[in-house]
Amino acid sequence: MHETRHLSARNVTLSFGGLQALNGVSFDVHPGEILAIIGPNGAGKTSLLNCINGFYRPDSGSIVFEGYEVTRTPAHKIASLGIARTFQSTALYTGLSTLDNLLAARHIHMRANMLQCLLYWGAAHREDIVHRQVVEEIIDFLEIEHIRKAVVGALPHGLRKRVELGRALALQPRLLLLDEPMTGMNQEEKEDMARFILDVHEKRGTTLVLIEHDMGLVMDIAQRMVVLDFGMKIAEGIPDEIRHNEAVIKAYLGEAV
């Protein structure tokens, strides 16, 4: 960990017509940390993730990942650089199985040409073996062996969220962006997801940026926090500092923590 910055955002500004979604947001993500981005609904949290992974292009500012300027890089290229993403609402292939959803995510690592893939020759066959090994390891890691052949659209919400996490892990990211991974879950499901998130961080060595509204869980698992309000950063620090920050209490936390 000789680098002090895994990702660096500087003065990121984004607007939609007359709506200012982000206003000069700057922060760093350090290698190997869990960083939480919190704030009220409409604060700009998801818009910020969309800028990082190439879904949105900021009006101004810069985003640098591992020395590469990615501010205006297309989303598929950013994924190939090592940034993966989950969403508030699961974005899975609901007609496919858990296994096939995870295999579909491996496309950015495919090197065989189209003819080889169609005929399943040589490099395509060897690649398929590797991709399946990666996916099967993730299925074991997330404890979803019992649903590996199940059609995703028929799964309960909590398991679909776990499959989506698995699909992101199938990209083998060095930076993983999690947009409300526990939304819609009951307490037991939230605790399971928190455990998997910590395992991704500790056992797979993945750097994480997390958006989540359950402040109890966020305070427990995040190492640092960035707080947004009306598209502006109003605070940054370790959880205990954020917990007692007057501006954050007024804008978002209240007496909840």
Question: Which role fits each region the language model picked out?
Answer:
Residues H2-V257:
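Glycine-rich phosphate-binding loops of nucleotide-dependent enzymes
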